Amino acid sequence: MIIAIDGPAASGKGTLGKRLAAHYGFRHLDTGVIYRAVAKALLDGGADLTDEARAVAAARKLDPGIFGDPALKSQTVGDAASVISAYAPLREALVSFQRQFAADPPGAVLDGRDIGTVICPDADVKIFVIADPVVRARRRTLEALARGEAADEARVLADILKRDERDRNRSAAPLTQAPDAVLLDNSNLDIEGGVRAAIDIVEAVRAGRRRV
């Protein structure tokens, strides 16, 4: 079984992905981490972020062992990942990695921007998570402060809006809701409420009912 979760930055899809995977005993892949890992490799190597060939080369040498590196969550790496994720050659280079992960038993939960539309268009369950940008900025700011990083909520909001525009308007795999994805508005839900709503969606789809 494959569960695809898509949505904009800081919408809560990563947390939902982890919790759904734990609930069902599936493997979980935050596909945004893949792009962050590539971005960090480029930054560490002093590479120009506009060099698509270097980005593709870094992707082909990707070591999944670094996916848990806390440095990948920094604002600098996140901003760089947002830039390089628009490169079609890079996205193509990472497709097979993601699809192989999804295909391995017993099941998988993948979250990102194009899981239900490009990576796993035949996923058993598709959820599109949204949340008000102001709420997302507040969450992202609190996360940064919890890591001991300086964060200004107004700047974070501006960055989120800029990233939304870039994600939705890029030519390669833009952020969009798949026609058969179920919308989950996470604006006014705490973590437990969001998880319960997501589980309800999965169970409804598994039972053959389409939740509106």
Swiss-Prot record:
Catalyzed reactions: CMP + ATP = CDP + ADP; dCMP + ATP = dCDP + ADP
GO molecular function per UniProt = ATP binding; CMP kinase activity; dCMP kinase activity
EC number(s) from the headed UniProt entry: 2.7.4.25
InterPro entries the UniProt entry points to: Cytidylate_kin, Cytidylate_kinase_dom, P-loop_NTPase
Main EC class the enzyme belongs to: transferase
Please provide, in alphabetical order, the Gene Ontology terms of the cellular component aspect for this entry: cytoplasm
Q: Which residues bind ATP?
A: G7, P8, A9, A10, S11, G12, K13, G14, T15
BP-aspect Gene Ontology terms:
pyrimidine nucleotide metabolic process
Kinase: present as a keyword of the record?
yes
Which UniProt key words apply to this protein? ATP-binding, Cytoplasm, Kinase, Nucleotide-binding, Transferase
Subcellular location as annotated = Cytoplasm
Q: Which family does it belong to?
A: Belongs to the cytidylate kinase family. Type 1 subfamily.
Recorded protein name is: Cytidylate kinase
What is the organism of origin for this protein? Rhodopseudomonas palustris (strain BisB5)
Lineage here is: Bacteria, Pseudomonadati, Pseudomonadota, Alphaproteobacteria, Hyphomicrobiales
